[in-house]
Amino acid sequence: MFPFSGLERIDLDGADLSLDPAWLSCTEADALFDALLAGIAWETHRIRMFGRQVDSPRLSCWIGDPGTSYTYSRTRFEPHPWPAALMPLRERLREALNIDFNSVLANRYRHGRDAMGWHSDDEPELGPQPVIASVSLGAARRFALKPRGMKSFDRTSHGTQSPGKKDGRLVLELPHGSLLVMRGDTQARYRHALPATARPVDERINLTFRRIVGVGAMANS
Protein backbone atom coordinates (compact mmCIF):
# COMPACT_ATOMS: atom_id res chain seq x y z
CA MET A 1 0.00 0.00 0.00
CA PHE A 2 2.93 2.34 0.72
CA PRO A 3 5.72 1.71 -1.80
CA PHE A 4 9.24 2.94 -1.04
CA SER A 5 8.51 3.26 2.69
CA GLY A 6 8.39 1.27 5.90
CA LEU A 7 5.11 2.71 7.14
CA GLU A 8 3.31 0.55 9.66
CA ARG A 9 -0.31 1.05 10.68
CA ILE A 10 -1.06 2.26 14.21
CA ASP A 11 -4.15 0.83 15.88
CA LEU A 12 -6.47 3.66 16.97
CA ASP A 13 -10.24 3.27 16.74
CA GLY A 14 -11.72 5.18 13.80
CA ALA A 15 -8.38 6.65 12.73
CA ASP A 16 -6.07 5.81 9.85
CA LEU A 17 -2.52 6.36 11.07
CA SER A 18 0.79 5.00 9.81
CA LEU A 19 4.30 5.66 11.08
CA ASP A 20 7.80 5.03 9.80
CA PRO A 21 10.19 6.12 12.57
CA ALA A 22 13.20 6.08 10.24
CA TRP A 23 11.76 7.14 6.89
CA LEU A 24 14.79 9.35 6.26
CA SER A 25 18.29 8.16 7.04
CA CYS A 26 20.19 10.08 9.71
CA THR A 27 22.41 11.60 7.02
CA GLU A 28 19.41 12.74 4.96
CA ALA A 29 17.58 14.08 8.00
CA ASP A 30 20.65 15.94 9.29
CA ALA A 31 21.25 17.63 5.94
CA LEU A 32 17.60 18.60 5.52
CA PHE A 33 17.37 19.96 9.06
CA ASP A 34 20.41 22.20 8.55
CA ALA A 35 19.20 23.38 5.14
CA LEU A 36 15.74 24.30 6.44
CA LEU A 37 17.04 26.10 9.52
CA ALA A 38 18.98 28.43 7.24
CA GLY A 39 16.78 28.41 4.14
CA ILE A 40 13.23 29.01 5.36
CA ALA A 41 11.78 32.46 6.07
CA TRP A 42 10.79 31.68 9.65
CA GLU A 43 8.32 34.05 11.27
CA THR A 44 6.02 34.28 14.27
CA HIS A 45 2.46 33.85 13.07
CA ARG A 46 -0.14 36.03 14.75
CA ILE A 47 -3.37 34.14 15.38
CA ARG A 48 -6.67 35.02 16.98
CA MET A 49 -7.47 33.34 20.31
CA PHE A 50 -10.15 34.24 22.82
CA GLY A 51 -11.02 37.38 20.88
CA ARG A 52 -7.51 38.82 20.62
CA GLN A 53 -4.40 38.53 18.48
CA VAL A 54 -1.55 36.56 20.06
CA ASP A 55 1.84 35.27 18.96
CA SER A 56 2.00 31.55 18.17
CA PRO A 57 4.41 29.72 20.52
CA ARG A 58 6.67 28.57 17.68
CA LEU A 59 8.12 29.84 14.39
CA SER A 60 6.32 28.96 11.17
CA CYS A 61 6.29 29.32 7.41
CA TRP A 62 3.47 28.50 4.98
CA ILE A 63 4.94 27.17 1.71
CA GLY A 64 3.12 26.15 -1.43
CA ASP A 65 2.30 26.41 -5.10
CA PRO A 66 0.97 29.76 -6.37
CA GLY A 67 -2.61 30.33 -5.24
CA THR A 68 -2.48 28.04 -2.21
CA SER A 69 -3.37 30.69 0.34
CA TYR A 70 -4.29 29.37 3.76
CA THR A 71 -6.45 30.86 6.48
CA TYR A 72 -6.73 29.77 10.07
CA SER A 73 -7.74 31.60 13.24
CA ARG A 74 -9.07 34.37 10.96
CA THR A 75 -5.58 35.07 9.64
CA ARG A 76 -4.72 34.60 5.97
CA PHE A 77 -1.28 33.42 4.90
CA GLU A 78 0.06 33.62 1.36
CA PRO A 79 2.48 30.87 0.37
CA HIS A 80 6.22 31.33 0.29
CA PRO A 81 7.88 29.65 -2.73
CA TRP A 82 9.17 26.13 -2.30
CA PRO A 83 12.81 26.17 -1.13
CA ALA A 84 15.11 23.96 -3.18
CA ALA A 85 15.78 21.72 -0.16
CA LEU A 86 12.13 20.63 -0.02
CA MET A 87 11.67 19.67 -3.66
CA PRO A 88 13.26 16.18 -3.41
CA LEU A 89 11.22 15.49 -0.27
CA ARG A 90 8.01 16.53 -2.01
CA GLU A 91 8.77 14.18 -4.90
CA ARG A 92 9.66 11.32 -2.58
CA LEU A 93 6.33 11.70 -0.77
CA ARG A 94 4.51 11.76 -4.10
CA GLU A 95 6.13 8.46 -5.04
CA ALA A 96 5.55 6.88 -1.63
CA LEU A 97 1.92 7.96 -1.13
CA ASN A 98 0.77 8.62 -4.72
CA ILE A 99 -0.33 12.14 -3.74
CA ASP A 100 0.91 15.40 -5.25
CA PHE A 101 1.07 17.60 -2.17
CA ASN A 102 0.86 21.27 -3.18
CA SER A 103 1.61 22.91 0.17
CA VAL A 104 3.39 22.40 3.47
CA LEU A 105 3.28 24.08 6.85
CA ALA A 106 6.74 24.25 8.39
CA ASN A 107 6.89 24.70 12.17
CA ARG A 108 10.05 25.27 14.17
CA TYR A 109 10.03 24.45 17.88
CA ARG A 110 13.03 26.16 19.45
CA HIS A 111 12.72 24.63 22.94
CA GLY A 112 10.27 22.80 25.16
CA ARG A 113 8.09 25.87 25.69
CA ASP A 114 7.27 26.01 21.99
CA ALA A 115 4.19 23.90 21.33
CA MET A 116 1.06 23.32 19.24
CA GLY A 117 -2.37 23.30 20.87
CA TRP A 118 -5.23 20.88 20.28
CA HIS A 119 -6.69 21.09 16.78
CA SER A 120 -7.76 19.07 13.75
CA ASP A 121 -6.51 19.62 10.21
CA ASP A 122 -10.07 19.85 8.94
CA GLU A 123 -10.01 23.09 6.97
CA PRO A 124 -12.53 23.11 4.09
CA GLU A 125 -9.83 23.62 1.46
CA LEU A 126 -8.33 20.23 2.38
CA GLY A 127 -11.51 18.41 1.38
CA PRO A 128 -13.08 15.39 3.08
CA GLN A 129 -10.75 12.79 4.59
CA PRO A 130 -7.53 14.72 3.90
CA VAL A 131 -4.14 13.04 3.82
CA ILE A 132 -1.56 14.76 6.02
CA ALA A 133 2.08 13.67 5.75
CA SER A 134 4.12 14.82 8.75
CA VAL A 135 7.93 14.70 8.61
CA SER A 136 9.83 15.37 11.85
CA LEU A 137 13.42 16.61 12.05
CA GLY A 138 15.62 17.37 15.03
CA ALA A 139 14.74 16.64 18.64
CA ALA A 140 12.15 13.95 19.32
CA ARG A 141 8.90 15.35 20.74
CA ARG A 142 5.68 13.73 21.93
CA PHE A 143 2.64 13.97 19.68
CA ALA A 144 -0.75 13.38 21.29
CA LEU A 145 -4.17 12.50 19.88
CA LYS A 146 -7.51 12.44 21.67
CA PRO A 147 -11.10 11.89 20.47
CA ARG A 148 -12.94 15.06 19.53
CA GLY A 149 -15.08 16.19 22.43
CA MET A 150 -12.77 14.82 25.13
CA LYS A 151 -12.03 17.69 27.51
CA SER A 152 -9.15 16.36 29.59
CA PHE A 153 -6.01 14.47 28.71
CA ASP A 154 -4.16 13.77 31.95
CA ARG A 155 -0.75 15.46 31.95
CA THR A 156 -0.06 15.84 28.24
CA SER A 157 -0.53 19.60 28.47
CA HIS A 158 3.01 19.42 29.91
CA GLY A 159 4.24 16.78 27.50
CA THR A 160 5.01 14.35 30.33
CA GLN A 161 2.80 11.36 29.53
CA SER A 162 4.71 8.33 28.33
CA PRO A 163 4.18 7.14 24.75
CA GLY A 164 1.36 4.63 24.40
CA LYS A 165 -2.41 4.25 24.16
CA LYS A 166 -4.93 4.69 26.95
CA ASP A 167 -8.74 5.03 26.89
CA GLY A 168 -8.85 5.90 23.20
CA ARG A 169 -6.04 8.42 23.53
CA LEU A 170 -2.60 8.04 22.01
CA VAL A 171 0.84 9.53 22.59
CA LEU A 172 3.59 8.95 20.02
CA GLU A 173 7.23 9.96 20.12
CA LEU A 174 8.26 11.28 16.71
CA PRO A 175 12.02 10.92 16.19
CA HIS A 176 14.42 12.61 13.78
CA GLY A 177 13.62 11.55 10.20
CA SER A 178 10.23 10.00 10.98
CA LEU A 179 7.13 10.10 8.77
CA LEU A 180 3.61 10.03 10.22
CA VAL A 181 0.68 9.79 7.79
CA MET A 182 -2.86 10.69 8.88
CA ARG A 183 -5.74 9.94 6.51
CA GLY A 184 -9.35 8.75 6.37
CA ASP A 185 -11.51 9.94 9.29
CA THR A 186 -8.56 10.83 11.53
CA GLN A 187 -9.22 14.58 11.39
CA ALA A 188 -12.98 14.16 11.72
CA ARG A 189 -12.70 11.98 14.82
CA TYR A 190 -9.56 13.17 16.59
CA ARG A 191 -7.67 16.27 17.65
CA HIS A 192 -3.92 16.33 17.99
CA ALA A 193 -1.29 18.47 19.70
CA LEU A 194 2.41 18.85 20.35
CA PRO A 195 2.40 19.64 24.09
CA ALA A 196 4.95 21.84 25.79
CA THR A 197 7.45 20.02 27.96
CA ALA A 198 9.63 20.94 30.92
CA ARG A 199 12.23 18.44 29.71
CA PRO A 200 15.33 20.01 28.14
CA VAL A 201 14.99 19.50 24.39
CA ASP A 202 16.83 20.79 21.35
CA GLU A 203 15.23 22.36 18.29
CA ARG A 204 12.71 20.49 16.17
CA ILE A 205 11.27 21.15 12.71
CA ASN A 206 7.99 19.61 11.61
CA LEU A 207 6.73 19.62 8.03
CA THR A 208 3.05 18.83 7.46
CA PHE A 209 2.42 18.31 3.76
CA ARG A 210 -1.12 18.85 2.50
CA ARG A 211 -3.07 19.03 -0.73
CA ILE A 212 -5.40 22.01 -1.03
CA VAL A 213 -8.37 21.12 -3.21
CA GLY A 214 -10.34 24.35 -2.76
CA VAL A 215 -7.76 27.12 -3.16
CA GLY A 216 -8.48 30.20 -1.07
CA ALA A 217 -11.24 28.61 0.98
CA MET A 218 -11.68 29.74 4.55
CA ALA A 219 -10.30 27.59 7.36
CA ASN A 220 -11.81 27.44 10.80
CA SER A 221 -8.94 26.35 13.01
Name each model feature, range by range.
Residues 1-155, 164-221:
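Non-heme Fe(II) oxygenase metal-center motifs and adjacent flexible, charged/small-residue loops
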